């Protein structure tokens, strides 16, 4: 193991043990740092302490020339800045060359979401007479009812569900927990799945799956990739013209709440956002909702007799 690899390994351990970051987040950090190490090797830079501000500018220029988006570059810079902050704390370097690097200004993207008519169609495609269909229906209902992330859904255990109060304890990023309520549709879908479909799926698996709510066809805990595949297949059945991604039901949850008058702070808490700015991206509304509001409230929207 080279000295560079040793320092990267120490940083990854720090993210796992002290910061308690998710595997997905750590993977992103690792990829960014390893890519930068390859850049250092090409440039003939032996150690992290030798990297200068000018080197970081060359690195960024190459990233732009590769056609990377500003969002991707911003994530890489953020990861490297955190890495050097760790090295400084451990007194392994004397300065952070990424501290003066300005993060690229990102385009504000409006999250994609489903209209109510599209949701209704999506909720009718699962064959709820089968264990997998019952599971899929419970996944759809719970994702839309709570706005939780797919990774949070996959980590749910039976002890996290309170069906008497219709609430779920969600284990979010950075070991943060939050209670989120859900409605009658999600309640009914969960009851059907837990009392029938899940028992049949569990019988095919091993003891390690006992605690997890959502299981695959072999009785093992369902993964993020598994949920992504399920959502894609369900959307194909509902409408071949639409593409659904794992976060779309979360976007839809937030958008529909705000469109119906929920306050931003409450939605922030339900989503588990640490910053309000992360929630504000959902303040877009549909054209129909905008038109309805305009026609209802603008004094000169139409002539009154």
Swiss-Prot record:
Transmembrane segments: none annotated. Its main location: cytoplasm. InterPro entries: CB (IPR044068), DNA_brk_join_enz (IPR011010), Integrase-like_cat_sf (IPR013762), Integrase_catalytic (IPR002104), Integrase_recombinase_N (IPR010998), Integrase_SAM-like_N (IPR004107), Recomb_XerC (IPR011931), Tyrosine_recombinase_XerC/XerD (IPR023009). One of its GO terms (cellular component) is cytoplasm. Residues 2-88 form the Core-binding (CB) domain. The keyword Transcription does not apply. The keyword Iron-sulfur does not apply. Residues 109-295 form the Tyr recombinase domain. It is found in: Cytoplasm. GO terms for biological process: cell division; chromosome segregation; DNA transposition. The active site is at residues 149, 173, 247, 250, 273, 282. One of its GO terms (molecular function) is tyrosine-based site-specific recombinase activity. SUPFAM superfamilies: DNA breaking-rejoining enzymes. Keywords: Cell cycle, Cell division, Chromosome partition, Cytoplasm, DNA integration, DNA recombination, DNA-binding. Site-specific tyrosine recombinase, which acts by catalyzing the cutting and rejoining of the recombining DNA molecules. The XerC-XerD complex is essential to convert dimers of the bacterial chromosome into monomers to permit their segregation at cell division. It also contributes to the segregational stability of plasmids. Belongs to the 'phage' integrase family. XerC subfamily. Forms a cyclic heterotetrameric complex composed of two molecules of XerC and two molecules of XerD. HAMAP family: Recomb_XerC_XerD (MF_01808). This is Tyrosine recombinase XerC. It comes from Bacillus pumilus (strain SAFR-032). The lineage of its organism: Bacteria, Bacillati, Bacillota, Bacilli, Bacillales. The gene is xerC.
């Amino acid at each position: 193991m080279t000295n560079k690899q040793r320092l990267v390994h120490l940083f990854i351990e720090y993210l796992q043990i002290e910061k308690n970051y998710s595997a997905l987040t750590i993977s992103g950090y690792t990829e960014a740092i390893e890519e930068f190490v390859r850049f250092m090797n090409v440039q003939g830079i032996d150690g992290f302490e030798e990297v200068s501000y000018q080197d970081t500018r060359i690195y960024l220029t190459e990233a732009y020339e590769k056609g990377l988006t500003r969002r991707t570059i911003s994530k890489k810079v953020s990861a490297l800045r955190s890495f050097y902050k760790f090295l400084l704390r451990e007194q392994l370097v004397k300065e952070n060359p990424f501290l003066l690097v300005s993060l690229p200004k990102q385009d504000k993207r409006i999250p994609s979401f489903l209209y109510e008519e599209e949701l209704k169609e999506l909720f009718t495609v699962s064959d709820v007479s089968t264990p997998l269909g019952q599971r899929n229906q419970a996944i759809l209902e719970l994702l839309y009812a709570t706005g939780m992330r797919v990774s949070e859904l996959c980590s749910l255990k039976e002890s996290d569900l309170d069906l008497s109060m219709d609430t779920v304890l969600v284990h979010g990023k950075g070991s943060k927990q939050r209670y989120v309520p859900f409605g009658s549709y999600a309640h009914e879908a969960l009851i059907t799945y837990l009392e029938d479909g899940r028992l049949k799926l569990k019988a095919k698996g091993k003891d390690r799956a006992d605690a997890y709510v959502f299981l695959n066809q072999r009785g093992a805990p369902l993964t993020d990739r598994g949920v992504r595949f399920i959502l894609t297949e369900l959307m194909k059945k509902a409408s071949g013209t639409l593409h659904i991604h794992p976060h779309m039901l979360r976007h839809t949850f937030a958008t529909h709440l705000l469109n119906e008058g929920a306050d931003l702070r409450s939605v922030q808490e339900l989503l588990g956002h640490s910053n309000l700015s992360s929630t504000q991206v959902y303040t877009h509304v549909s054209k129909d909702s905008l038109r309805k509001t305009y026609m209802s409230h603008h004094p000169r929207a139409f002539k009154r007799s």
